[in-house]
């Protein structure tokens, strides 16, 4: 009887065991049930953007400096030196850069996907309930624009030299479907569109952006 009781208890507890979320994760309905959930989602995006494959190194002072030939040290470890030399010569297909470039591309689109998840869920929210909703929405648009812009400038042609060239996939939705690849001009237009939406949402955010002169200049240049 004891054995059967133990088996019944184990099987009965199976469903509740499987319902337990991994540490640091929440079901989507719970994640976005209040403004704090949206804040936490944005914190998660920023934490991912701070990884060494993105703005924690590669897109701040690592890979981008190698491309600009601003980083060369004869005392650098040999395994890193071959990466630097390949980047100095813009050899994107060099096997030594394959892992790093794959990480930049993959992590950036992961963050874009997270931003899209925030944007899709926040569409169901009454923004008047809390002023932070509009700010969060603006931040998500800004993140999406910024990441696409950096991918475009790193992995696409110079629009001034090749205006009709192909651009990059521009991700608007939180799903696993293949994303549409836009032309270079269309890609930049998409970025400017997201920046315009971000600016409208952040119009009351005077703490971080007391002047719109910089963004107005960039849009005018586009």
Model-predicted segments: where are they?
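Short coil/linker segments at helix-helix boundaries
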Residues: 131, 154-189
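Generic helix N-cap/helix-start motif at coil->alpha-helix transitions
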Residues: 217-220
